[in-house]
Amino acid sequence: MSSLAVRDPAMDRSLRSVFVGNIPYEATEEQLKDIFSEVGSVVSFRLVYDRETGKPKGYGFCEYQDQETALSAMRNLNGREFSGRALRVDNAASEKNKEELKSLGPAAPIIDSPYGDPIDPEDAPESITRAVASLPPEQMFELMKQMKLCVQNSHQEARNMLLQNPQLAYALLQAQVVMRIMDPEIALKILHRKIHVTPLIPGKSQSVSVSGPGPGPGPGLCPGPNVLLNQQNPPAPQPQHLARRPVKDIPPLMQTPIQGGIPAPGPIPAAVPGAGPGSLTPGGAMQPQLGMPGVGPVPLERGQVQMSDPRAPIPRGPVTPGGLPPRGLLGDAPNDPRGGTLLSVTGEVEPRGYLGPPHQGPPMHHASGHDTRGPSSHEMRGGPLGDPRLLIGEPRGPMIDQRGLPMDGRGGRDSRAMETRAMETEVLETRVMERRGMETCAMETRGMEARGMDARGLEMRGPVPSSRGPMTGGIQGPGPINIGAGGPPQGPRQVPGISGVGNPGAGMQGTGIQGTGMQGAGIQGGGMQGAGIQGVSIQGGGIQGGGIQGASKQGGSQPSSFSPGQSQVTPQDQEKAALIMQVLQLTADQIAMLPPEQRQSILILKEQIQKSTGAS
């Protein structure tokens, strides 16, 4: 017995104590102590009470002075009847009574965890990572091999084991990343995906984010081969229960959030550079935007190719004093219910990109071609483009009628030029003109912005200076500004009214209305090749004297797809001719509803046509 006395005090106490069960609830410790004192001296007797209710649980512990007395109590008092119940006396150190014995205080034996010291759940991932990293490669490979065999032989048991021990599943997942069996990004997705697993054993399934199962994982988490003999790495079960666990060992960059950003719309390939005087809405309707800086790109109609000179200045003019964009010829005013977009045809172009005060020059039919090399005061503001099949040349010779007839742009013209096809003009936007006749979306042939061409380019009252060549009324600038086919400008002059000098199609095909402001062959202000506006261009003297020169194609110097004498009448020509006829057929009431500048321009236009008709 002396050998027992030198044992650990807690263990010795457990050997000297007995477990007493099936105690009546009304019994007191004093009554029980008296009963157990029959076999020997009782050091203490303690009943176990429920912590929540405070009621006795029906069992307790009796401590004797020595182990022999405790053994005697188990032999003699087991089955003793007390208050109608038979008391059960057993060894307090048995496995069944260990938990109850702990309530007695430090007398309970201290059992070391085979997994190491407990660890805070928040530090568990880092601890597991260190444990996995400390394993030699050979041992890690052997563990993974054994786990594979375990899954192959007993899949369900392996799954249950990993579900009940999430720290083990995490360690295996980490080992796969270390051994490069699994991509870190895939491991992260497995860890963070939300999976609700039905517990196989009630109360056993744990979420890693709450706490480590049982004893927390420690540096010695990954046991040797003897522990993982029947374990293997399951590809699917591992992530379960790891969904909400904080992962500190995997770099944050692996956590790649899936961001479904809305792709920004790509740039419209054929966009007017900068803030043009006008732009087309996606539906093709012209929106008056003269003088408004920052106008976005303009979509084209029917796949027309719009070419522009990147070096051209971007006119950014201030808003007009009234705060509203300058009004166009037909329905550009915000208060016009008809909503047309034909341009205003009066006023000079200011370099800053908005319409200035009207030019008070003589009417167009009185203007004579001046041999000046300066820019015309009636520059067009620049519509986006015209027909891509046509190119503008520099009209240095006599204008050729579409049917091959020579014509004098300043006054005389063949009477046949007044035919319907001779009256077509790029001034009329053929794609936006409404049947009311008021919305002719001026000067746009399949994509030309009506407002893009400063209507003051069509100023019929101002003089039309003719530049360096017998252009017969066409307004030539000092040098050819070749906008065709994306070519760079060939002249020093940049048309301030065009949103980006070289807006292709800036030339309004004046195949018929060869107006003073309309630079010949699509702002033939020096040969600006309107990339498709050639041929049928508004020759700036075309309305002078002779008025509307019918369907004139720039002959001679015209490097376009039209040969100098070509007399074909295309469907586009017929459409444009019909459009200009609609403009000319506007009633007096319709014209009266227009702003003063536009109304005056329409009247001047009709007057020129009447005079030219009478002359023919």
From Swiss-Prot:
SMART domains: RRM. GO terms for molecular function: mRNA binding; RNA binding. GO terms for cellular component: intracellular membrane-bounded organelle; mRNA cleavage and polyadenylation specificity factor complex; nucleoplasm. It comes from the Eukaryota. The modification Phosphoserine is found at residue 563. The modification Phosphothreonine is found at residue 320. Gene3D superfamilies: 1.25.40.630, 3.30.70.330, Transcription termination and cleavage factor, C-terminal domain. One of its GO terms (biological process) is mRNA 3'-end processing. Residues 505-549 are annotated as: 9 X 5 AA tandem repeats of G-[AT]-G-[MI]-Q. Disulfide bonds: none annotated. PROSITE patterns: RRM (PS50102). Its main location: nucleus. May play a significant role in AAUAAA-independent mRNA polyadenylation in germ cells. Directly involved in the binding to pre-mRNAs. This is Cleavage stimulation factor subunit 2 tau variant.
